[in-house]
Amino acid sequence: MQSYTNRICAVCGDTPAKIHYGVLACFGCKGFFRRAVKDGRNKYVCRFEKNCEVTKFERNACRYCRFRKCLLVGMNPDYVRPDREKSKKGKTVLSKKKSVSRSLSYRLADPSDWTSFLSPSSRKQLSEIGKLAETCSTSTNFDGIGNFSLKSLIADRSLARKTGDSEAMDCSNSPRQLNEQFLGIERIVQCVDYIDRFLVMLEEEHCRKFSVEDKSALISDTMIHLLLFESTSRFVAKGAPGLEDLKLSLAQLPICTTHLTQKIADVFETYLRKPPSIIEYSVLKAYIVLSAESTVLSNSLNESLSLARENLSELLFKVIKHSRNKTSISAANSLSTILHFVYESRNLASRIRQSQQPFFVRDSDPKIPFHKILTDIINPEVSDLLLTTANCRKLSTQMGSSLSSVPPVPPPSDTVPLFHFSPPSLSPCQISAPPPPQQQYTDYSQMPSTSSYPANSSPFQSPYRPNSLSSFPKIPLEMTKSIEEFLRPNGMTTDEMNKPLEKNWADGFRLTPVFNKDIVSQFFPELSNINQHHPF
């Protein structure tokens, strides 16, 4: 069989050649034969004697002789399909019409109604998140929560929403500005309300209930991040001069944060490079809540936050793509820039929180209003088992060093007889030492205490005990009843309850049928000889 490179065209002798229209032909002769059958069957004329030589160098000199040779070598005109190209052209024209109609429908649609490209579930989620971001509390009197902790504040705000005592209003168009303080109580209460409402939405979506401890841990971990995000968004509207306003806002904290100036500038420049729109701002605010540290939350809340974070990332990508009319690649680049800002600002928020922890020490006297709430946010209560164990070890080490001042009891020598030590007596009279013990059992509970035991030691300190027990008599062991004897009914003998099996237990007619004799012998070879003498 000839190889692929050695196959020669039967018409002109060119290589390589394949089977076209029934014979080996090159691609040039194949195309020429198809065009000749379709158009030039009666149009070609030879200028010479109709005997031209057709080679790969002169095959284009005479089309009449080339077409005749194609027919002579056996190329079949019936194999040519003239309608094949028409069907291809029809498909391309139809696809072009569909693409044009699709592009025209996109252009004729309302540009503001880009949410029509989202799924119903995505539109519902976007609407709920937008309502959370636009809703704020109308209360301005916070004197009643001055001594509240963070958990008490969460419970109070939840109860106020259920009873209708706290009304909500649209803050998207409200001219009233929040307190300029970074840790103002009004801003903190609004963040608590936002996170609590967001968790209620997750509870309805995942059919779960989150505890107050989980809510408190989530608020403590994301509060500084949310406040930093809101401040940056407000000051970015002023442009580059807004950076100085942001620095002044952070400089009002109890402990100065000037060492974070460069980090603040980097985060501000990242946000200023591609500021999000209003809708993207609401989605991004919810994403910050979902980016909490997983080590401080329960497993159920971590699972719910992880699922919601995946859905929200996909929703944020769709919002960027359709609202800004971008391609998928451009939308992915914008999303990466926004998420980079989220994690850079989270790093800055954690450093701000660490810098303020020395001022907000737990179990300390209140120095500023709402000190307990701020302490629970900046320096929350740690319930980690490892940290708790480390603190217990540290405390025990300190107690051991304080007890080391008590003079130790000297060990007994060989000449001093061993005797029992009882706890120190509370009587002020002097008590003499007891006589040495004898080699028989003595009631030591009635023995008085000795004056050699240090009287200034703690009554809870264990007395010195000898290492040798040779002076004490051994107590004989008494066999107790077995559990079978306790469970045996009255009047039943031992043989009836626990009768041991005999060696020929497998030979009994009632225990082993005749047809199981061989099976028993396979499992118990030592009984195979015995079974021969005891027929069933």
From Swiss-Prot:
Subcellular location: Nucleus
Domain NR LBD positions: 155-378
Superkingdom of origin: Eukaryota
CDD domains linked to this entry: NR_DBD_HNF4A
Gene Ontology biological process terms in this record: cell differentiation; hormone-mediated signaling pathway; intracellular receptor signaling pathway; negative regulation of transcription by RNA polymerase II; positive regulation of transcription by RNA polymerase II
Keywords: DNA-binding, Metal-binding, Nucleus, Receptor, Transcription, Transcription regulation, Zinc, Zinc-finger
Compositionally biased spans, kind Polar residues: 439-465
Matches recorded under SMART domains: ZnF_C4 (SM00399)
Gene3D superfamilies: Erythroid Transcription Factor GATA-1, subunit A (3.30.50.10), Retinoid X Receptor (1.10.565.10)
One Pfam family here: zf-C4
A GO MF term: zinc ion binding
DNA-binding region: 6-82
Region (Disordered): 427-465
A single GO cellular-component term on record: nucleus
Main location group: nucleus
Transmembrane regions: none
UniProt entry tagged with the keyword Nucleotidyltransferase: no
Listed InterPro entries: HNF4-like_DBD, NHR-like_dom_sf, Nucl_hrmn_rcpt_lig-bd, Orphan_Nuclear_Rcpt, Znf_hrmn_rcpt, Znf_NHR/GATA
Zinc finger map (NR C4-type): 9-29, 46-70
Function (record text): Orphan nuclear receptor.
Record family assignment: Belongs to the nuclear hormone receptor family.
Protein name (Swiss-Prot/TrEMBL): Nuclear hormone receptor family member nhr-7
Organism: Caenorhabditis elegans
